[in-house]
Amino acid sequence: FSKDDMNIYLQTFGMTLDVQLGALSLGQRKKIFMSFAMATHTKLLLMDEPTNGLDIPGKRQFRDFIQQGISSERIFVISTHQVKDIESVLNHVLLIDRSEIVRNEELKAGTDLEAYFEAAMQGKEVHHD
């Protein structure tokens, strides 16, 4: 863990270390937790619905945050229903439906993930649970 790096990541979100977690909104707490996770320099970072609770500027900051952390030595695994929030930072997709791998492939720049998902799931029953 690097406190200096955490400060750098927090600055991406316009935040500092001197905050009280209990006084923060869900979106603000997520920014703190993501900054902490990045500052640990973990090679695999799992994120479940990371843009949930973020406002529109926060979602842009999140994309900048991910771009800042991308390296050949780090993998981000993002589970989300909000594909528009993250499609510009993805280069690979693993689409799983009820334990079945539907797609596992590199993405071309500019891929519309909603259209990609619809094409991948064509003819399949879409589960909402």
Q: What do these predicted ranges mean?
A:
Residues 60-72:
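Helical segment within the ABC ATPase nucleotide-binding domain
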